[in-house]
């Protein structure tokens, strides 16, 4: 574990900016802001999804910011989503960084006259790059660790 009793202001600013980038991704997802979400990525980004977790074949392997539109638009199939980012790590190397973040993503949809909740436990593995003083995702790998699906009670509508 790094010793953060005293870190340079620029390192602190970079770490905060990267955390804000990770959180902005979740906020944009829940707000159905696909354009805002895409803007968090470099033009030549690489985005890979592994629905069966680590060690599985990729279910989506996308290159370029514009290729992300269908993935982000897919969230519109749900009534509401809520992404909770948890623990994360970041390793800085100048204007590049790597990191990982754990997330519980909640998805509510209409199903058979009722509502269904699908919770996905996700681990993101990221490569970040800073250009023009702004951090963006150069690569994002999304690993689904497990999924739980259950029927919701009638109370507590979005």
Residue spans of the language-model regions?
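Aromatic-acidic/polar surface patches that form glycan- and anion
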Residues: 14, 18, 30, 61, ...
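Enrichment for repetitive, rod-forming helical segments
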Residues: 26, 72, 147-148
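Short, low-complexity N-terminal intrinsically disordered segments enriched in polar/charged residues
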Residues: 1-43
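A beta-strand edge to alpha-helix "cap/lid" segment located at domain peripheries
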Residues: 2-7, 76-158
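A solvent-exposed, acidic/Ser-Thr-rich amphipathic alpha-helical stretch
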Residues: 34-104
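A near-ubiquitous, low-amplitude feature marking generic local secondary-structure context
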Residues: 1-8, 20, 51-55, 73, ...
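Alpha-helical elements of Rossmann-like donor-binding domains used by nucleotide-donor carbohydrate transfer enzymes
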Residues: 24, 67-70, 123
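Charge-dense, low-complexity intrinsically disordered segments
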Residues: 8, 12, 58-62, 115
């Amino acid at each position: 574990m790094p010793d953060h009793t005293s870190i340079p202001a620029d390192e602190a600013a970079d770490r905060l900016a990267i955390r804000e980038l990770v959180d902005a991704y979740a906020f944009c997802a829940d707000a159905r802001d696909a354009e805002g979400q895409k803007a968090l990525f470099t033009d030549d980004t690489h985005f890979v999804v592994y629905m069966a977790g680590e060690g599985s074949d990729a279910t989506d392997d996308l290159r370029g910011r514009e290729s992300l539109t269908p993935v982000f638009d897919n969230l519109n199939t749900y009534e509401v989503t809520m992404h909770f980012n948890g623990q994360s790590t970041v390793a800085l190397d100048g204007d590049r960084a790597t990191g990982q973040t754990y997330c519980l993503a909640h998805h509510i949809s209409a199903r058979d006259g009722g509502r269904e909740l699908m919770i996905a436990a996700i681990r993101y593995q990221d490569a970040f790059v800073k250009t023009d003083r702004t951090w963006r995702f150069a690569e994002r790998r999304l690993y689904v660790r497990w999924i739980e699906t259950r029927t919701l009670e009638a109370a507590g509508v979005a």
